[in-house]
């Protein structure tokens, strides 16, 4: 049975061509520890990872590539921001459609928050932000694209509101960093969190955060330890990115991310158009089936490839299992680590069945999926 993978919102598959080869070559031939080992491979590896920082900074129009921090991904980056910048009792604004990677650190660390309402399609009601701002509000933290609704938020308008109220805006772009068209300098954005294994088509356990330099210089590090620089002191050095990258990194993974990032950016138009075609095809096919209801962003508003559904004919968990057992189709069912999103969308506590095709999903695979849904629903 052919594998049909429709869970790219959880992790991308297939990865960018050649990504696995980069990791294999590093482990078998080029293994080294950057900023530690004195050797040709170490210098070459350092340069490749530096180029990755520069590429991300260029994508986001950030003039300080040294403040692009590379780590295990979006969850670690959000923990760095929340634990490094805020204190118990501080107040922030979040949307009512946030992921647990943001909400759990806020709750764990006693940070007070107000939720900006979203509509039933998952879009932030930007005209409600101003009324929630308090004198003690420190920041707005939002996910740029919903992993349940697929809704892409109006970052430009939210950035203007943040500027007007003189508060920092922090963006979680784990789902769609390349196509957001973020300009950190012009928009005054404090940070952009990104994941390597989703939109960037790289390996799991990679990602990071692009920080405005003044924040990168003052944020409390999440961890501390050896960095390969300023080893004569037991104090954390003020060098960037070193002060926020203690310990040996996932070097092979970051080299693979550098490769997949270049591929993703160089082919962004082609990949976006392919993803859009299969997403629209799947959306149209599913909405035509009696007993299936699409939840979240419509096709005529800014959206990603995420399509969530509910059904009044069958349990969505049963549908997901039948997809796998009968057709080899992989989806995700439940709350998707975002109970607040489901509360806002009216699908809590059952959740939704989520499809998320990717740039390598074929129209044939979408056709098989739609036909499979018809067979399952009609028994």
Regions found by a protein language model. Give the residues of each.
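Pyridoxal 5′-phosphate
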Residues: 1-379
